[in-house]
Amino acid sequence: MRIGVVGDPDVVVGFRLAGLTDVYEVKSPEQAAKAIEELNSNSEIGLIITTERIGEQVRDTISAVKKVVVEVPDKNGPIVRENDPVKVLVRNAVGVDIK
């Protein structure tokens, strides 16, 4: 299993330095969607990493992906959300609200 990365120049440089080769540097949501679709169609890729901001811009594309997609903060830090998606998943799964 290989890992694919889709991100802005500041994010992808770190993953390239870590030795990942399936790295796509994108500058627009259209480029990001195309890169994610390419990674999704590659049978050797098992995990796709992208930034939260790109994730929000191409949510429909990510929803159609059959692989694990992880969204990480970019250089500007994490996106502040009203509802933490992890808390929502836990509450739905076990019926307990995490504070």
Swiss-Prot record:
GO molecular-function terms, A-Z: ATP binding; proton-transporting ATP synthase activity, rotational mechanism; proton-transporting ATPase activity, rotational mechanism
InterPro entries attached to this UniProt entry: ATPase_V1-cplx_f_g_su (IPR008218), ATPase_V1-cplx_fsu_bac/arc (IPR022944), ATPase_V1_fsu_sf (IPR036906)
Domain of life: Archaea
GO CC annotation: plasma membrane
Membrane topology category: Peripheral membrane protein
GO terms under biological process: proton motive force-driven plasma membrane ATP synthesis
Compartment(s) where it occurs, according to its Swiss-Prot or TrEMBL record: Cell membrane
Keywords from the UniProt entry: ATP synthesis, Cell membrane, Hydrogen ion transport, Ion transport, Membrane, Transport
Family annotation (Pfam families): ATP-synt_F
Function: Component of the A-type ATP synthase that produces ATP from ADP in the presence of a proton gradient across the membrane.
Family: Belongs to the V-ATPase F subunit family.
Subunit structure: Has multiple subunits with at least A(3), B(3), C, D, E, F, H, I and proteolipid K(x).
Protein name as it appears in the record: A-type ATP synthase subunit F
Organism from which the protein derives: Methanococcus maripaludis (strain C5 / ATCC BAA-1333)
